[in-house]
Amino acid sequence: MSGLARLQRLQKFGFLMVSASANRPIQRYQCSRTEKPQKRTSANALLNHLIFKIKSTGPITVSEYMREVLTNPVKGYYMHNDMLGEHGDFVTSPEISQIFGELLGVWCISEWVSAGKPKAIQLVELGPGRGTLTDDLLRVFSNFGRLLDSCDISVHLVEVSPKLSDIQAQRLTGKSIEVELDSNSPVYKNGITKTGRPVCWYQDIQDVPNGYSFYIAHEFFDALPIHKLQKIKDGWREMLIDIDPKLPDKLRFVLGSNMSLVAKTFVQDDEPRDHVEVCPSAAVIIQKLAQQINSYGGAALIADYGHMGEKTDTFRGFRAHQLHDVLTDPGTADLTADVDFNFMRRMVGEAASCLGPVTQHVFLKNMGIDIRLKVLLEKSNDVTVQKQLIHGYNVLMNPDQMGQRFKFFSVVPHSRLKNTLKTKMPPVAGFSTLLMT
């Protein structure tokens, strides 16, 4: 049976059951261009730190600014905040509907079966948020118990935020987990999930063990630090962040005086745009994933804001679900930039094969979201749950909300796309049309 036919049967016969998470609160995705002023603490310690740093060493790159604002150990946005959900600054697809995580779980199982059912799976999520997506994936794996009984499944979470790792541990294991202080171990937390799977936390993707792995990165790459580059007559200059001379407690963008080394490394000679955003961290990570996947098997599934190398200025901030000036009140808003999937493809190079990007609407449609929604609606007699399911579906699929803005991209081994006379691999689910028979 082909991967798509197998996927269709799984959706049609409802092997994935409705969970209590169907009652999770639904939040409407917003992308407004205006922001109502909010009261925040006037003593912005992070701003003072940045001003002192600039006075001491000169203007800083946008990449350095993002790194400080998001992951500064004392005042970084990700380090001490629960920024997700109704009372946070943004909402993600796994928080909107259980169907999203279920379909990604089915995708993993479909790829595992296509690979010949390896004896072990490492489920690796980069930037797991509240742990909602990993929780949904593990529930799907549990519902396929007979198929996966002989498979050794472990969970590996790459998370730099102490606050979020606490939330993830509570969700996945049902209890708090103390941080380990063993300097010889890359694992800083470990436990057993509610479904009986070992789970470990790491600060860096480089520390995750080798092995057949599914790497899930949902809204991860868009938060990595970028460099903003501007083309002038004699080459590329880097956009920097400096202190506004007229307002000493404010920051502003300025153009660097020297040619950009980042541009020499990453910008192609035939680049048609006059302004680009480059993410060296994304290059390092995607190359690492490609090498691991081609050596040990598995796949990477990336879902994020993104484009194919045509956009220019996408750097923006979000606070309380509204757009927020990136240089105002640093540390109180999320900072993000669209993922350049053309750049990601170039960075993978010949190390592995790439699929996509395709829009979230197309990917979920190909994964059988309509079939899955129908099954869930038929299994529930609760009108409130039915309304939540329909609302969540609309937010995920509507082109004006998440359906068009989010893209799916995958990295797979070269062998996954090779067909021989003896072996014909099924298409990779989600990136090929689901055939209805």
Swiss-Prot record:
It comes from Xenopus laevis (African clawed frog). It catalyses: L-arginyl-[protein] + 2 S-adenosyl-L-methionine = N(omega),N(omega)'-dimethyl-L-arginyl-[protein] + 2 S-adenosyl-L-homocysteine + 2 H(+). It comes from the Eukaryota. It is found in: Mitochondrion. Arginine methyltransferase involved in the assembly or stability of mitochondrial NADH:ubiquinone oxidoreductase complex (complex I). Acts by mediating symmetric dimethylation of 'Arg-118' of ndufs2 after it assembles into the complex I, stabilizing the early intermediate complex. Residues 1-42 form a transit peptide. Keywords: Methyltransferase, Mitochondrion, Transferase, Transit peptide. One of its GO terms (cellular component) is mitochondrion. GO terms for molecular function: protein-arginine omega-N symmetric methyltransferase activity. It is an enzyme of class 2 (transferase). This is Protein arginine methyltransferase NDUFAF7, mitochondrial.
